[in-house]
Regions:
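Surface-exposed, glycine-biased beta-strand/turn segments
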Residues: 1-117, 145, 154, 158, ...
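Histidine-centered active-site/metal-ligand motif
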Residues: 50, 131, 165-167
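Short, solvent-exposed beta-edge and connector elements
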Residues: 68, 97-102, 125-136
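A residue-level detector for short acidic-glycine micro-motifs
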Residues: 73, 131-134, 151-154
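Conserved, short, structured surface segments that act as functional micro-motifs
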Residues: 85-88, 139-207, 211
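Low-complexity, Gly/Ser/Thr/Pro-rich intrinsically disordered linker/tail segments
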Residues: 197-233
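Long amphipathic alpha-helices with heptad-repeat character
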Residues: 232, 236-239, 243-253
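Polycationic, low-complexity disordered segments in secreted or periplasmic proteins
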Residues: 254-263
Length: 263
């Protein structure tokens, strides 16, 4: 009974990278394309790989440390992953939350591991968060599972997207071209696919897809205490408008709205 096995996996306590995680239902251009968000050869009709998973998040959404760990690298890639960082975790703790019965479901192009992965010699121990607008930690800091460590954004090549998200990776080496050194985050975290979302969740993503979400023009990286953030000259984020439109949907329950309400 596959469903029963999945239920057993669900009993394991996990801290998700954002609350109630779901894949982006739309792609960068605003087209319905949940496959675009997934790990594997899911881009350009299978010709190009995607080395993580895109989790829908309006800019400014809290990002959580999924396990205890240490911040080991952080930088800004204005033409790629924007403001991003790596966290090193205990491989044994990561293994404890692995979904033993998970199988890719949405597309035949999804993959579990990159082709260079050898489970006998390689330890999966890095977590990466990308396209952020603010980071509350610095390299060398230790963090606890459940700690708010960043805010989502649209920095790097996510600027102009119709599908705001946090790009989330799990890896056995920090660097790697394409899918190299990466594994499917869904083997560890349950992230809703398009066919698992509620009508309200799809409604919110549909409203978000009507907007091009640009990173603030002329931003600079600022430092204050332990916080790294984007100094915004023109804040083009429109979270409140998306929420207001969603409020007008008579079928949208208050409980669903709270999931995205800006803190």
């Amino acid at each position: 009974n596959t469903a029963g096995k999945e239920d057993e996996d669900d009993k394991i306590f996990r801290v998700n990278p954002v609350k109630d995680p779901q894949v982006t239902y739309y792609n960068f251009r605003g087209e319905v394309y949940p496959d675009w968000a997934k790990f594997g050869l899911t881009r350009s009709n299978g010709a190009r790989g995607h080395q993580g998973i895109d989790i829908f998040a309006l800019p400014g959404t809290d990002v959580y440390a999924v396990l205890d760990g240490k911040i080991v690298d952080m930088y800004v890639d204005k033409t790629g992953y924007g403001l991003n960082f790596y966290m090193e975790v205990d491989p044994k703790e990561l293994e404890k939350i692995k979904r033993k019965n998970y199988k890719p479901k949405l597309s035949a192009r999804e993959m579990d591991y990159s082709s260079n992965y050898n489970p006998d010699t390689m330890q999966i121990k890095y977590i990466r968060y990308c396209h952020l607008s603010k980071v509350n930690v610095k390299i060398g800091d230790t963090v606890k599972a459940g700690q708010v460590i960043a805010k989502t954004g649209t920095t790097g090549n996510a600027s102009g997207t119709h599908a705001p998200h946090v790009h989330f990776e799990i890896a056995f080496e920090m660097r790697g071209r394409g899918l190299t050194n990466r594994v499917d985050p869904e083997m560890y975290f349950k992230i809703k696919n398009g066919n698992q979302m509620t009508k309200q969740e799809i409604k919110i993503q549909t409203e978000a897809a009507k907007t091009e979400w640009f990173e603030p023009k002329g931003y600079d990286i600022g430092f204050r205490d332990k916080s790294i953030f984007l100094e915004k000259k023109d804040d083009l984020h429109k979270n409140e408008k998306i929420i207001d439109k969603a409020k007008n949907d008579k079928n949208l329950k208050k409980a669903e709205l709270k999931k995205i309400k800006r803190k």
